[in-house]
Amino acid sequence: MWKEKVQQYEDQIINDLKGLLAIESVRDDAKASEDAPVGPGPRKALDYMYEIAHRDGFTTHDVDHIAGRIEAGKGNDVLGILCHVDVVPAGDGWDSNPFEPVVTEDAIIARGTLDDKGPTIAAYYAIKILEDMNVDWKKRIHMIIGTDEESDWKCTDRYFKTEEMPTLGFAPDAEFPCIHGEKGITTFDLVQNKLAEDQDEPDYELITFKSGERYNMVPDHAEARVLVKENMTDVIQDFEYFLEQNHLQGDSTVDSGILVLTVEGKAVHGMDPSIGVNAGLYLLKFLASLNLDNNAQAFVAFSNRYLFDSDFGEKMGMKFHTDVMGDVTNNIGVITYDNENAGLFGINLRYPEGFEFEKAMDRFANEIQQYGFEVKLGKVQPPHYVDKNDPFVQKLVTAYRNQTNDMTEPYTIGGGTYARNLDKGVAFGAMFSDSEDLMHQKNEYITKKQLFNATSIYLEAIYSLCVEE
């Protein structure tokens, strides 16, 4: 029944998704304003969702142009469906323009197809189809749309300051069948304090170093600019050997007497950096072999001492595991250095229930002072958990099982979704077990089958939660 309903809307679903994907909704603080708090792209994507909602007869409510909602249904209780329309930067290496959607016979290719524009449109159409069926709603629905999920969650922070908290809800921002627990997440900077000037003339001076754009992505590119005072050829040969030994791609060029070294890695989501290749940490590992100036030597030595090959926090003294949520993970997403202001490591740390975060951070902060570094802590989101046997969770899982015959149990993840904003919130799709996960990677795509099947599952789930008694 539900899949047949969705079939009637397939062309509309694709067309509306294409329109949303064509918006480059990457956060841009340089162009932020009161009318576009995280930049014009995210604001445009939010307005686009309002436009299709108004076209279809829904009421919307805007919250300071950084978040908002589409409203449906009636009743005392509220089902929240928490989506986001911002995306991470496209990065390099795409086979097509990431913001000009390519529709093939089987798939749609563009940045945001999986995370989270495709699932957002799927959830929207589930609501629209039920509305078109003139169902007798028993709950209200607030489809909450954010514009800063990929960075600081300013959108939901602002939204929930003034807006009604849903009774329960789900975020279509992960995987089926249902994710009922999420690790704690924090971002923080490890900031180098400027050291004394060099007493002796160093052989090499690190001018600048840059790797990474987002704390929650493994950097796939790194660049160092080094003033080489002698033996330039030897350094280049050593670098080429280093790349070969570590099975890396990279390059070396000379620009106005400055040696420019680059390393290419593999970008993946920061919730499991062990499956990526951190270009920045590898390039710092090579630089440690050079007789650098004092500041730079301290910077690269710190990286090797605490960060390189420490995806689970081992070198930081934070290794920890639970059976429910798994391991602490540690992603070094941003690395910067310049010879005027010293360096910074931007960290995305994720931790399971039971990890004594504050105690671990205090101990680490005290330890690294001796090496000229300090911790500047950002936002801390504690672990989030809903019992998988809760009737709400079971209704979602039943809808999934009815349409897939897959009896996989709900589980927990290291990623963070909007679900943690709710007392009774979970992540529900839209990826399936056979979906290729290219979130935050080049050539991101969603298959038409996945898009339509997710819409059908959301349709049944929302019906069971908001229409059936």
From Swiss-Prot:
* Name of the top EC class for this enzyme: hydrolase
- Which annotated residues bind Zn(2+) 2? H84, D115, D173
Q: Which branch of life, at top level?
A: Bacteria
What does the UniProt cofactor note say?
Binds 2 Zn(2+) ions per subunit.
Annotated signal sequence range: none
The entry's family comment says: Belongs to the peptidase M20A family.
* PANTHER family, A to Z: ACETYLORNITHINE DEACETYLASE, N-ACETYL-L-CITRULLINE DEACETYLASE
Q: What is this protein called?
A: Putative dipeptidase SAS1677
